[in-house]
Amino acid sequence: MPTETLQTGSMVKPVSPAGTFTSAVPLRILNKGPDYFRRQAEPNPKRLSAVERLEADKAKYVKSQEVINAKQEPVKPAVLAKPPVCPGAKRVLGSPTLKVFGNHAKTESGVQRETLKLEILKNIINSSEGSSSGSGHKHSSRNWPPHRDTTELHRHSFAESLKVYPTPGRGSPQESSSHVSRRLLEQSAESFLHVSHSSSDIRKVTSVKPLKAIPCSSSAPPLPPKPKVAAMKSPDADQVEPACGVSRRPSLQRSKSDLSDRYFRVDADVERFFNYCGLDPEELENLGMENFARANSDIISLNFRSASMISSDCEQSQDSNSDLRNDDSANDRVPYGISAIERNARIIKWLYSIKQARESQKVSHV
């Protein structure tokens, strides 16, 4: 072995395991002890909210000492105070009520409970109206009628509707019925009172429909039947009604000159197509007018059926008054000539004959 390797081997010292551990882990962590690791395992302490941090730093951005010393308390929802209830009312409200059989009147305890509830609601309304008395409305001076049971009201109204009040003999039946309906309306308006859960919804029902009383007395003569409205209308009223209603827009009307111009153009086009087969005047001069003599004799005498005549025929067919009338109208009609299909076939045949004559003339000249 060379001597250099022996020297280097003697210089290297063996490393103990304790030395490796101490070099890898710093001594300051080992000296802290187990409490240090326990504190890290625990959850973080409670953090301050933004309001608390601003409260702590208030002296930095607030100048007045009063604001610095004052503390802002959180806003709490307003709690509605319950109305005071007397001990007698508590006992009445807490006492059990008897069951009602057959929907008859309530027991005395139930009636007292309803009256006490109504008094409590009236006290609440009076107190709220007393605070707003500066507006000029004196609502607290109202005297609310006592609340009645619904079954009692129905029985009362039904009994009153059956009653017929005596009227003097000279009075007309219309006056007696009006008196009865007026009395019933006043009593029903006074008796009805709508009470809801909220104090502001308590109101007196005044919009009650008037009750129609049926007169039961045999002495009163029967009412005459009402005359029909259609018979009462006069011709003057018929003239006034269209003026009051919405006026109709006049339909579009063309002038006579425009219509005559249109009809003239249509007649010229029809004459040119059917009489001269739609040919231009130059072509007609080349072919010769004598060739159109037969076509004119066949076509000029035809009666063309317009759209207006077709619509009038449809209207006449819809009229189903009598068979004789339809037969007379059918006899009065002017007999038409050949059909449009046959007329077109003749024109096509005649044009084909002209074409053949042209070709034969060309062949003869060649």
Curated annotation (Swiss-Prot):
Q: Which InterPro entries match?
A: FAM110 (IPR025740), FAM110_C (IPR025741), FAM110_N (IPR025739)
The Gene Ontology CC terms held by the record are: centrosome; cytoplasm
Per UniProt, the keywords (alphabetical) are:
Cytoplasm, Cytoskeleton, Phosphoprotein
Residues where Phosphoserine is found: S234, S297
From the Swiss-Prot or TrEMBL record, state where the protein is found: Cytoplasm; Cytoplasm, Cytoskeleton, Microtubule organizing center, Centrosome
Q: Where is the composition biased (Basic and acidic residues)?
A: 322-331
Where do the segments described as Disordered lie? 127-150, 163-182, 214-253, 313-333
- Record-given protein name: Protein FAM110B
